[in-house]
Amino acid sequence: MSESMRNSGLKFCTVCASNNNRSMESHRVLEEAGYDVSSYGTGSAVRLPGLSIDKPNVYSFGTPYDDIYNDLISQSEDRYKQNGVLEMLDRNRKLKKAPEKWHDGRKVFDFVFTCEERCFDSVCEDLMNRGGQLNLIAHIINIDIKDDNENAKIGGRAILRLADMLRDKVFECEKNGTQFEDFIMDVFTEWQEKYPKLPLTYSAAYY
């Protein structure tokens, strides 16, 4: 069985505040590995660095990455090229059209990776408010990742490693006729030993 076929059965999601940096780097890494992945933000709006610290660029979710890219170029191409924002947006627009808000999405995922505690809390609260009518379990996993280019890349690789470990355990449990949920904490423990600087929090939720 090819890697892409092995990965096609599970649905993954990555979530950060603005659906631009951490969630999109993890989205890219998982997609390139053959996973079925979507990504979202939980913030009230998309916020990116501005020309001054006290004046960030603020956009509505759904604003195309192309439009954001062109707006920043019109402000100062040199500034946004230097701080890596244009490179980030260029990556993003190759993956999908626009940043999406978690609360507007209605897809069902097996695993949701959030990149900071407030995003984790927001996802868990939203799923609880939806009422679990489908009675489908979702594994919500928070990995604290600093919001900068370098840490987004480190976090993306770490999330891919965890996705691979979870996938392998799912297939092993299906083969052996055992319950995956009985072994998920063992997977987290093994992963956390490899990545002690990326604290992990977990909660089960229901669609």
UniProtKB/Swiss-Prot annotation:
Main location: nucleus
Keywords: Hydrolase, mRNA processing, Nucleus, Protein phosphatase
One MF annotation (Gene Ontology) recorded for this entry: protein serine/threonine phosphatase activity
Pfam family, one: Ssu72
Enzyme Commission code: 3.1.3.16
Enzymatic reactions: O-phospho-L-seryl-[protein] + H2O = L-seryl-[protein] + phosphate; O-phospho-L-threonyl-[protein] + H2O = L-threonyl-[protein] + phosphate
Family: Belongs to the SSU72 phosphatase family.
Name of the protein: RNA polymerase II subunit A C-terminal domain phosphatase SSU72
Species per Swiss-Prot/TrEMBL record: Kluyveromyces lactis (strain ATCC 8585 / CBS 2359 / DSM 70799 / NBRC 1267 / NRRL Y-1140 / WM37) (Yeast)
Taxonomic path: Eukaryota, Fungi, Dikarya, Ascomycota, Saccharomycotina
Gene: SSU72
